[in-house]
């Protein structure tokens, strides 16, 4: 990429090793489940990325697989994960949420189910208010 004149190269990757930062590695932990256990594991994953010298890493806030946007227990997990994500090098909200939507069509990609909305306002006013505070805090820190 550099030979083609690209600068500030960033590659979103599922795996990396010590020295990968030389190649613009931005590592995320892959498609993990939506649970408090998976959130706890992200703390260790982030520490290991730092130990390996890889400064750019992220996690799917709220996990990727599962998590019903109407379930209070998942909302709590999501909010705590969002708070953690606000202090990660890259803040990334991504996931395949429940309840699933019916397929849009009968051919190609349209024949597959789709996940529920996953924007911060999709979880209700209370969750949105908390997430908004963390987004504002992150923006304040970014400007420092």
What are the roles of these predicted feature ranges?
Residues 1-144:
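Catalytic-domain carbohydrate-binding cleft regions of carbohydrate-active enzymes
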């Amino acid at each position: 990429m550099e030979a083609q004149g690209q600068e500030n190269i960033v590659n979103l990757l599922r795996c990396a090793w010590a020295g990968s930062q030389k190649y613009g590695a931005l590592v995320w932990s892959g498609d993990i489940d939506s649970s408090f256990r998976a959130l706890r594991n992200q703390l260790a994953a982030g520490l290991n990325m730092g130990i390996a010298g890889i400064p750019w890493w992220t996690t799917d806030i709220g996990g990727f697989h599962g998590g019903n946007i109407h379930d209070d227990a998942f909302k709590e997990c999501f909010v705590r994960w969002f708070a953690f994500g606000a202090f990660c090098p890259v803040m990334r909200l991504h996931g395949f949420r429940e309840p699933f939507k019916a397929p849009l069509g009968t051919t190609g990609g349209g024949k597959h189910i789709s996940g529920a909305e996953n924007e911060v306002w999709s979880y209700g006013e209370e969750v949105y208010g908390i997430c908004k505070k963390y987004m504002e805090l992150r923006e304040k820190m970014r400007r420092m």
